[in-house]
């Protein structure tokens, strides 16, 4: 029963265990977090939300943070941009509603180099500046 439990995957192992042993309820993690910080209220005077993840692929659409933020932003009519280290494009991602998905890591650099704090910071800043300038 627990093996097929929605939300009981790798990140939900503890939740699935508590569910099976103590009849605990399972809640979507990003929904719980967004509700706890009143994210809808924070969006009231917002024009753009920038979110991110290490890798954006079809798994992102299965309840991960960027997709939860996108859904909340869409409900309020707020544009949402995602930044990521690696982007694996798909039709589903192209149609899900992100204004733009920006891959920040140059593919020709080794992962160790890309992950260095100075390089990562520079890559993020550069991509965000280019995106903002493209909006003008």
Where are these regions (language model features)?
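N-terminal loops that bind phosphate or other acidic moieties
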Residues: 1-136
